[in-house]
Amino acid sequence: MISAMEQRVRHYWTLRSHDFGAVRKNELENEMGQKWLREIERLLPEKEHLRILDVGTGTGFFAVLLAQAGHQVEGIDLTPAMLEEARLLAAQRNLDIVFREMDAQALSYAEESFDVVLSRNLTWTLPEPEKAYREWFRVLKPGGWLLNFDADYAANVRSRMQNCKVAPDSPYGHIGMTDALQQENDEITLTMDIGQLRPAWDLRVLRRIGFSDCRSDATVGQRILGALDLTHAPMFGIWARKA
């Protein structure tokens, strides 16, 4: 049974699934996809065929990108409509990717199942992000890596609310969003426990859980998104190893 907040988040992403899928498909077909692949591959363990879990796969961007690179990838998401888009994207490229409906905070995988767990723009949506991090640690093999790309989106919302004269940052992934969906996005963001200073919060939690080599990189957004990155909430990368 998922919580009321998780139901709210799932409903929000259901409404956005089709347009969001179009954005991610376009990324795969332009230079954005190659930028992401280079960024991820420089962080991956030196092994040709990794078993990778894409948590919060959404419409399957990371899963497709890494499966095309020869890795064994599974993608999970809480929103069935997003998974439908992901399966379609994989089928169009003749890729054998397993997509499952699953809560990122309560994985149904056995311990030490994956070489890599990665995620993009997910942790900010989770009601219990520390619980999710503990689950991701559990399913990683010893020596495995966690890669998380996210942003302090609450900072962007707070900035807009505190200074209404300043034009808000608008993520390019929000193209076509209605005012009602934007308001829902803001309310969900500010409700989450993770609406605090990041990535410092994440690094503290990861070390407490037992990860080692915990690092963050605040320049990821500039390298990949360039001018499309948010001013008030730039994308950061986090990586940590399970000893």
Residue ranges and their predicted role:
Residues Q105-V116:
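A short acidic, Gly/Pro-enriched loop at the edge of an enzyme's catalytic core
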Residues D193-G210, S216:
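Short alpha-helix
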Residues I209-S212, G226-A243:
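Core SAM-dependent methyltransferase catalytic element
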Residues E130-W145:
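A short glycine-rich, Lys/Arg-flanked "PGG" loop and its adjoining helix->strand segment in the class I
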Residues V116-P129:
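A short SAM/SAH-binding and catalytic strip from SAM-dependent methyltransferases
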Residues R51-V55, T59-A106:
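Class I SAM-dependent methyltransferase SAM/SAH-binding core
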Residues M1-E48, F61-L65, W145-D179, V220:
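Conserved class I S-adenosyl-L-methionine
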